[in-house]
Amino acid sequence: LEVKVNTVIIKNYNEHQIIPITQRFFEMGVSVRFIEYMDVGGTKNWNPEQVVFGDEIRTIIATRFGRLKPLKQQKYGEVANRWSLSNGYEIGFIESISKPFCQSCTRARISANGKLYTCLFSERGYDLKSLITMGADIKDLRDAVIALWRKRDDRYSELRTVQQVETNPVAVSYTHLRAH
């Protein structure tokens, strides 16, 4: 079982933990992924000035562990930019604020109330629960998800401005399904 630990870094809150987090998970042999603080799920009082960008995190890590080397993407739609230390330890960076990846996103999410969201930031969900209630089988669900995915036009991260974004909170499971 491959384990990856995701951690969100927020300026003036936990950025002082970047080195200890890296050290701890390096010692455990567990990959860590640093996530830029995002305005996801209607996060209240999100402020872009609180974002610690991936480049900044890499600079901090380099002061203790040496220069990081970028790694090639393993598969299309991979959300983490992977880097390695000179000893081969891999660190991931999910940089949806500074380096949006909307065009290559392959992630969909299903909420607790059975709605499919084609973007983590989306306020608009598609009702899959009703399909199931009406007797849809797995092929029907698959076809519905594929059709919804093909017509998606979500580009929230690419279109985000530096102004605070007003959204309605959506309770979304962070377990994702991969749409192919």
Indicate where each model-derived feature is located.
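Conserved small/polar residues in nucleotide/adenosyl-binding loops
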Residues: 175-180
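Charged phosphate-binding loop/patch that engages nucleotide di/tri-phosphates or the phosphate backbone
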Residues: 147-174
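Conserved C-terminal portion of the radical SAM core fold
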Residues: 1-44, 58-66
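Short, mixed-charge, low-aromatic patches
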Residues: 12-19, 100-104, 163
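Proline- and acidic/polar-enriched loop/turn elements at helix boundaries
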Residues: 7-8, 37, 72-74, 161
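Accessory C-terminal segments flanking Radical SAM cores
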Residues: 41-157
